[in-house]
């Protein structure tokens, strides 16, 4: 279950702190009786809905300039000025920078991390996972009656990955007349003609080192005009990404529209 929830390989599951695990299970009432469990809600048609809405909101603001699909290759900081260089060798200067990506990516592009930053950020690691969007029903349980939103497959032979198939019709309120599934690290590949898209992901790995470094993160927030947010700074979910960005916005004195 731990591997399925956090998309972690079996070899890393045993490094997940047991106290953090029990707290998570308790907060989500995963161990409660069926009648005491919360009714979970999802965003119809997926997270792209709120991502697109945020982009439209920013694009409509004349004070905001957005750059999309640009590969950042290097970031340097000097005298409270931050230089951002992209793959086309364009450089732009900024007063502050906010990283909304995982620490492994940050360490790749920031060339001047000091010892304090490096010690905290290097404690975080990620696991690569491949997802297949498809309509091959053979990757779902053979009994239609037991189809669930999340379907974990445990192969008979020992493997170093977790295989989960998500029933997208149920998760994102998609018409059942056209079956749609997302299989993460499938133990067998979907039929070639059934595949719509292949997506590579990197999910955070949570162990004692990263849990401790999350507590240390406030020590480098704002250090050298550099800030951090993202799901990795919480429990790895979309809500954690939003919560961390809201808390960061408050530090800049930004009014939260729904508060």
Residue ranges, per PLM feature:
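Active-site/ligand-binding neighborhood in enzyme catalytic cores
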Residues: 1-73
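Short catalytic/ligand-binding loop motif for oxyanion handling, primarily in non-cytosolic enzymes
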Residues: 4-10, 106-108, 192, 236-238
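A structural signal for well-ordered alpha-helical segments within the folded catalytic domains
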Residues: 45-52, 104, 243-246
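Active-site catalytic microenvironments for nucleophilic, acid-base chemistry
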Residues: 57, 112, 251, 255
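A structural signal for the hydrophobic beta-strands that form the central parallel beta-sheet
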Residues: 66-68, 99, 228
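Conserved beta-strand termini and adjacent loop/short-helix elements that scaffold enzyme active sites
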Residues: 69-71, 87, 229
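Mid-domain catalytic core of redox enzymes
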Residues: 73-202
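Conserved flavin/dinucleotide-binding core of flavoenzymes
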Residues: 159-259
